[in-house]
């Protein structure tokens, strides 16, 4: 509910000390979870579990519009680059996928691909590793047996620094590999 988080940001600006933590923890969980499309940007409709891992894969125009506004406001308040990035990527998604050639917008993107819910948004381990490598697959929370119904919903369950230490990579190097992999995965 973006309005609740907007309220927290406004309360922080009015001097309520815990309000910013309430907002940023939630914003970070949303952006790092499967609810956020880690490859193509934009938010799925909602999370189906308490870990923010598995989304209902439909993407709604109105949800994404409200979330762009929220992440821009969070960036204005905190100056955390990650919020600007999420807002930008979500706008890019909306313009690329939901805008009609004549300028209007479609109201949503269906959850089903090829007759299967989420098919377009999940990855088999082998395909993910072939394209992006094990370090990136690990950073996206993927597992050889799959983290959801035998396949992998991409999410960011661990901080980049923790994954870098686990994979013996420099955090900046891993961040670069993630960006390269996102572009390659998007082209599939």
Residue ranges of predicted features:
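Glycan-recognition and catalytic cores of secretory/periplasmic carbohydrate-active enzymes
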Residues: 1-188
